[in-house]
């Protein structure tokens, strides 16, 4: 049995459900996650166990105890696969004094808020580090990263010495994505993601403001506030946002992303940007902040440009020159590369090799 653990049910739905479905003929999967908005969509798992944790709290003691109780009686033949750095930290704390029973894998899909530049994050890193260094080598057999920079930073921080893998992406179901056939006469620019400061939402609004007098371009935001993340904008900031751009809320990406022309990803940090892969596959021109989790996508797929230091003026310059890039996009070539390297099938095959070695 393979146990997928995540501190948010959306994580076990997004990409991981597709992986579970792809490997269901080889393995059985149980999800351990707090059941929230996505509880009725987690149908690909053989079973879902409700992890009773309040993810809006920094440390929820009851949640740590509940996770401990769920994993302490697992069998030696079972495998645990943890998703996200936050879940890994919660797992390490909750299992501090437990005897290790299972083969345990952790996917760090991005370093997130903990490795941001905020003062609170810096303090948290200092406080949590002794716990991580003490238990990570004892309790984790394999760490999976999505880019080299995240690997280097976290290995130095944690002193992890066991097996390390680089797997770029979480698996894209390319069969669901509607393909773009033509570009709009009035260019539609879109930001897709949670409305977090760390995702670059404020930089995006500055970019949009630079085109406030232009009648040949429109700016959209698709996503929502995340109350469980300290980087999230608040309701007051959301109301201001609605006055500056066209706010869509959450959209059905597979069926709606193709309606737009240009995807902006000004995120401060990414593991391996899923929305960039989706935008590139659909056929959008993509511009992103030059970070480890976006650079390789843009470079390998040749689907747009990266911007150093999230420079708003450079974004504006590239957007103004958009037509010459759009005219030269080879979306068929992009799609073939994504299928080969970043699809659900490609990532499932990598996971399958790791799972087979755990049995």
Model-derived regions, located:
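Glycosyltransferase donor-sugar binding loop
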Residues: 32-37, 192, 218-233
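Short His-centered aromatic/hydrophobic patch
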Residues: 82-90, 108-109
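Nucleotide-activated donor-binding/catalytic signature segment of Leloir-type glycosyltransferases, i.e.
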Residues: 232-250
